[in-house]
Curated annotation (Swiss-Prot):
Residues 154-223 form the DRBM domain. This is Ribonuclease 3. Its EC number is 3.1.26.3. Belongs to the ribonuclease III family. The keyword Cytoplasm applies. PROSITE patterns: DS_RBD (PS50137), RNASE_3_1 (PS00517), RNASE_3_2 (PS50142). It comes from Aliarcobacter butzleri (strain RM4018). Its cofactor is Mg(2+). The lineage of its organism: Bacteria, Pseudomonadati, Campylobacterota, Epsilonproteobacteria, Campylobacterales. It is found in: Cytoplasm. The gene is rnc.
Length: 224
């Protein structure tokens, strides 16, 4: 059995049932009788609850719509990948040889799913009161400053102002596709400015994916 002590130290949690951590780290490509999809489903629900409560208490003057948008900026593939990297989760996941060749250990979708599964596993074994401080600690370590200015920015509007000034044109968003089960569908959007592709992003709705893509484009334009 592999040594998970470093991962458990990063989590500040020791699994009593090691089979649970193995299941949480096993991607479906690994072709075992088990994989992390069920734990991922559970983790997604629990993360939404914990982050939702955290934001409710942190931003007492924000309305429901604002809180939903702030949570959506954290509880998504990009956000979970960031948290997964915080605990170096890619070093521990079980993936197929083909996924290894395709750099699966750094793939956002695989890392995000594994992070949700690990959180689901901790919840299953030890409950909400144990899991909550773990999630909030990782969240606050990964995001230096969680505030409304950072999390509730309208990147699409900001980008359009930049492109109109620089290129006399507006960005074009193309829906590249959608994937995932109905309860957890993700949309992928590419962004084009003046005929040039500035990247892709995904989100739980087309609007959120467009916001994420706009942020990527803003960051790239700053470097040009």
């Amino acid at each position: 059995m592999s040594d998970y002590s470093k991962l458990e130290k990063c989590l500040d949690y020791q699994f009593k049932n090691k089979n649970l951590i193995i299941e949480a780290l096993t991607h479906k490509s690994f072709k075992k009788p088990y994989n992390n999809e069920r734990l991922e489903f559970l983790g997604d629900a629990v993360l939404n609850l914990i982050v939702g409560e955290y934001l409710y208490l942190k931003f007492p003057k924000s309305n429901e719509g604002e809180l939903s948008k702030i949570r959506a900026s954290l509880v998504n593939e990009t956000g979970f990948t960031r948290l997964a990297n915080e605990i170096k989760l890619g070093e521990y996941i079980f993936i197929s040889t083909a996924e290894e060749r395709n750099k699966g250990r750094t793939k956002a979708s695989i890392l995000s799913d594994a992070f949700e599964a690990i959180m689901g596993a901790i919840y299953l074994e030890s409950g909400l009161n144990t899991l909550k401080p773990i999630i909030l600690r990782i969240l606050e370590e990964s995001y230096d400053k969680i505030n409304l200015d950072v999390l509730f920015s309208d990147y699409k509007t900001a980008l359009q102002e930049i492109t109109q000034a620089r290129f006399a044109s507006i960005p074009e968003y193309k829906i590249e596709g959608s994937y995932g089960p109905d309860h957890k569908k993700e949309f992928e959007v590419s962004i084009w400015i003046d005929g040039k592709n500035y990247g892709k992003a995904s989100g739980k709705s087309k609007k959120l994916a467009q916001q994420a893509a706009a942020k990527i484009a803003i960051d790239k334009l700053k470097e040009e």
